[in-house]
């Protein structure tokens, strides 16, 4: 049959459907397309890639001109018509029937002759029905999985979700399915509320995507039209068991640790309070009913659902010797089900927690626990009903005898961390990376002691020897391990006590066994985003922050971890948390980059950067090359060719009495600049440039341009660093002087500057600290979505240029802005300028970290 097959057998519908199909075959017209300014009205959001070989694709709404909605008919094989081959069922999966057991009707059919169809069409012909798997109705279930049909209407930001997987790049080993990896807040999927992370997409309208390459699924979603029907499969949530436990406090209090709560979520999107550790010898361990992963619902008569972490801690502390607990225990799982994607954030082991006991501290620092760390997979927000890793199951389910485990290295390495190796205490598994080879095998457990690796005896090995054995083990690794939770618990307690001793020592005396820095307290500006929920190595409660945030580091004595609090425009936050030190950030980033090299920053102006039309004889390239990028490092000259790794910039608070200049960089900057001046002419203005070009009759000196008397004079001023940027066009010099910018700033207006990133540093040197905002596109597809006249090639060039811009000038940006629409980006920029317009600002400090 042809693609324009009619949706039913009646003559009335045939011609309508065939005509629509013929229209679809007409090629789109491109004659009216215009090549936009590369940094004109365009934007960003879309494709993204994960870590360690995982990938995802954010789905924008349709690129280019909006096409006519597709009217592809559903093909119904009968005894007379031979339709397309039905989709091949995925082995081990049930194939859902889209509309129950009755005949399928094309939803866009306007024909009223359904009775004619039912009389004229025989029942569908089934070949070898015994070989087919049982069908499932949509919005039904088979006990293990639930199937649902979801209809979404494409919004301004597309469908509002990201996907990963496919035959060519499985998101889950041995499963070619297409999985939802992210629901974008405010998008169509989020507003609808039915689609969830880890849902497996089986069908997009009439296209079977249960076993296709990733690009085919992306294409199906892009071409689905404004209304998209999805058939998805998801795991049935395991029911929780509610239990009441009475505990009698002992010398170690209640004997367990907790994490979670409002503002301190243990699992992103979940405010519940979870048990994260059972302390050896404590009341909880002796009672035996509480386990890691249990969810606390109430303490005595106090409800612990949707409360702050501090409230939960206070409720547990303010109890008598006999404590009544109400807990929810996770339900059982189908452990052998390989079609459920792993939950990359369901491990309740290494996140921040607080001990509930009489003498425990609620925070500690230190980097005693040395680890072999492997790259993490992408974070996927979980639900309470995520699969529970094997290492969270009941202790009695695991043998205490040595056992052989065979792991195959993947893109995430082996997927576990080790500790130990001092004084013959043994090598222990301290962390299982969710979704990594160790986790997916289900054989390795936190608390396992590693006895050997590929025949190499590690019973008395040092940490370095064990790490080396694991690193050189090859792709297939045979591990002999023995579950020794008591020994591991004693080791953990020793580490905890040692950390507290060192922390107390460093806090009280400023010295101790930690290698300390002379700087005990300082203010820094973050030059990267940090999400504490994605850091499995945190020794205590972490503090998340974004690029450009000001942090008050109240203790920088440790080499690996600092204590800090956020500084907002309204003052300092009360919450204190742990952040990675500058040294740790740089060490991790260098390990990630490995042999990847970037072009060294030069600080010279490029001829085609921000002055379209200027010749290659761009004047500043020869005369401003002395201005180079500074780094916050004090690295030796032998490393001069390496890019500085952005971590923190020391800052100091300064009072100013002028309106700060504004520099917008990235796609859509011209549109934003124009809108700011148009909407707020009393707040924003532009400065008068200088030129050696002769004045024309209708031009006014000092109003249209500052006309310089001689070329020699302007060349001298450029060499004397009186210009933030200059260039040559048609043998005439043009430039923006520092004095012109200062004149606007001292009148109380923000001077909007259309300059390159090099100007930021020159303004700082002139004590005119600009508000520099970088518009960072989310993806090539998002650029095309915000400017539908762009071709893919044009958007790709703009995206690449933006990435190079960030790489070259990232350390000088005040803030980085992203959004799904121009309006969203514009509103964010206005808010940033408002926040940065006070009389007190944070400026770079000459101090070294």
UniProtKB/Swiss-Prot annotation:
Q: Where is the PDZ domain?
A: 149-235, 244-330, 404-484
GO BP terms in the entry: cell-cell adhesion; chemical synaptic transmission; establishment of planar polarity; establishment or maintenance of epithelial cell apical/basal polarity; nervous system development; protein localization to synapse; receptor clustering; receptor localization to synapse
> Ranges for the SH3 domain?
519-589
Q: Which SUPFAM superfamilies match?
A: P-loop containing nucleoside triphosphate hydrolases, PDZ domain-like, SH3-domain
Biased region (Polar residues) positions are 57-69
Which GO molecular function annotations are given, in alphabetical order? ionotropic glutamate receptor binding; kinase binding; PDZ domain binding; phosphatase binding; protein domain specific binding; protein kinase binding; protein phosphatase binding; structural constituent of postsynaptic density
Task: Mark out the compositionally biased spans (Gly residues).
Answer: 41-53
Where in this protein does the record put region Disordered? Answer: 32-101
The Guanylate kinase-like domain extends over 659-834
- Phosphoserine PTM positions read 157
The record ties this protein, via Pfam families, to: Guanylate_kin, MAGUK_N_PEST, PDZ, PDZ_assoc, SH3_1
Q: Which UniProt keywords apply?
A: Phosphoprotein, Repeat, SH3 domain
Q: What does this protein do?
A: Required for learning most likely through its role in synaptic plasticity following NMDA receptor signaling.
Question: Family per UniProt?
Answer: Belongs to the MAGUK family.
Protein's recorded name: Disks large homolog 3
């Amino acid at each position: 049959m042809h693609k324009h097959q009619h949706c039913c057998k009646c003559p009335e519908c045939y011609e309508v459907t065939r005509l629509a199909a013929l229209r679809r075959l007409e090629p789109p017209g491109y004659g009216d397309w215009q090549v936009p300014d590369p940094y004109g009205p365009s934007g960003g959001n879309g494709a993204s890639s994960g870590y360690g070989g995982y990938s995802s694709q954010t789905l924008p709404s349709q690129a280019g001109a909006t096409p006519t909605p597709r009217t592809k008919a559903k093909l119904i094989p009968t005894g007379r018509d031979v339709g397309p081959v039905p989709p091949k069922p995925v082995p081990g999966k049930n194939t859902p029937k889209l509309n129950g057991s009755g005949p399928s009707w094309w939803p866009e059919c306007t024909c009223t002759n359904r009775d004619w169809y039912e009389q004229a069409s025989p029942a569908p012909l089934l070949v070898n029905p015994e070989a087919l798997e049982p069908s499932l109705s949509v919005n039904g279930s088979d006990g293990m999985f639930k199937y649902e049909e979801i209809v979404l209407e494409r919004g301004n930001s597309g469908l509002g979700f990201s996907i990963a997987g496919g035959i060519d790049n499985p998101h889950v080993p041995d499963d070619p399915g297409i999985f939802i990896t992210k629901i974008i807040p405010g998008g169509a999927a989020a507003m609808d509320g039915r689609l969830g992370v880890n849902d497996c997409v089986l069908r997009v309208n009439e296209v079977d995507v249960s076993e296709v390459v990733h690009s085919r699924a992306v294409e199906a979603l892009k071409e689905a039209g404004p209304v998209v029907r999805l058939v998805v499969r998801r795991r049935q949530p395991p029911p929780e068991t509610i239990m009441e436990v009475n505990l009698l406090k002992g010398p170690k209090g209640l004997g367990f640790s907790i994490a979670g709560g409002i503002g301190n979520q243990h699992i992103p999107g979940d405010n519940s309070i979870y048990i994260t550790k059972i302390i050896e010898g404590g009341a909880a361990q002796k009672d035996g009913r509480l386990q890691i992963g249990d969810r606390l619902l109430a303490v005595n008569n106090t409800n612990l659902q949707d409360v702050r972490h501090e409230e939960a801690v206070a409720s547990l502390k303010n109890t008598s010797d006999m404590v009544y607990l109400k807990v929810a225990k996770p339900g059982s799982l189908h452990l052998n089900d390989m079609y459920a994607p792993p939950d990359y954030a369901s491990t309740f082991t290494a996140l921040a927690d607080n001990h509930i006991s009489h003498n425990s501290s609620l925070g500690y620092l230190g980097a005693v626990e040395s680890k072999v760390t492997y790259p993490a997979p992408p974070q996927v927000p979980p639900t309470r009903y995520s699969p529970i890793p094997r290492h969270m199951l009941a202790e009695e389910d695991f043998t205490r005898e040595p056992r052989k485990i065979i792991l195959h290295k993947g893109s995430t390495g082996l997927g576990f961390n080790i500790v130990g190796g001092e004084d013959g205490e043994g090598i222990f598994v301290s962390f299982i990376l969710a979704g990594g080879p160790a986790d997916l095998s289900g054989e390795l457990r936190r608390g396992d002691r590693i006895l050997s690796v590929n025949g190499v005896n590690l019973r008395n090995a040092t940490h370095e020897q064990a790490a080396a054995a694991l690193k050189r083990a090859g792709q297939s690794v045979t591990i002999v391990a023995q579950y020794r939770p008591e020994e591991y618990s004693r080791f953990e307690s020793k580490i905890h006590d040692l950390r507290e001793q060192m922390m107390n020592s460093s806090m009280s005396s400023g010295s101790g066994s930690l290698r300390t820095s002379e700087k005990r307290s300082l203010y820094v500006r973050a030059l990267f985003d940090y999400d504490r929920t994605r850091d499995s190595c945190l020794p205590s409660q972490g503090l998340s922050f974004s690029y450009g945030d000001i942090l008050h580091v109240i203790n920088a004595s440790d080499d690996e971890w600092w204590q800090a609090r956020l500084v907002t425009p309204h003052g300092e936050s009360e919450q204190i948390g742990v952040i990675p030190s500058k040294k740790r950030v740089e060490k991790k980033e260098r390990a990630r980059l490995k042999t990847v090299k970037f072009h060294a920053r030069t600080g010279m102006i490029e001829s085609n950067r921000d002055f379209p039309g200027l010749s290659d004889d761009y004047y500043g390239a020869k005369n401003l090359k002395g201005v180079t990028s500074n780094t916050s490092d004090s690295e030796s000259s032998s490393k001069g060719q390496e890019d500085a790794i952005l971590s923190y910039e020391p800052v100091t608070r300064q009072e100013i009495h002028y309106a700060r200049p504004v520099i917008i960089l990235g796609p859509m900057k011209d549109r934003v600049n124009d809108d700011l001046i148009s909407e707020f002419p009393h707040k924003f203005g532009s400065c008068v440039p200088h030129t050696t070009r002769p004045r024309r009759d209708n031009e006014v000196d000092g109003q249209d341009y500052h006309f310089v008397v001689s070329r020699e004079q302007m060349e001298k001023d450029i060499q004397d660093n009186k210009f933030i940027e200059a260039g040559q066009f048609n043998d005439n010099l043009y430039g923006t002087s520092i004095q012109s910018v200062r004149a606007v700033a001292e009148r109380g207006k923000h001077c909007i500057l259309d300059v390159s990133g090099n100007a930021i540093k020159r303004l700082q040197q002139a004590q005119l600290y600009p508000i520099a905002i970088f518009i960072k596109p989310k993806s090539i597809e998002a650029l095309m979505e915000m400017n539908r006249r762009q071709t893919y090639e044009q958007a790709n060039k703009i995206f690449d240029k933006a990435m190079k811009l960030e790489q070259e000038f990232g350390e000088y940006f005040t803030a980085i802005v992203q959004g799904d629409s121009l309006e969203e980006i514009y509103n964010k920029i206005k808010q940033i300028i408002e926040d940065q317009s006070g009389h007190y600002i944070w400026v770079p400090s000459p101090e070294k970290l």
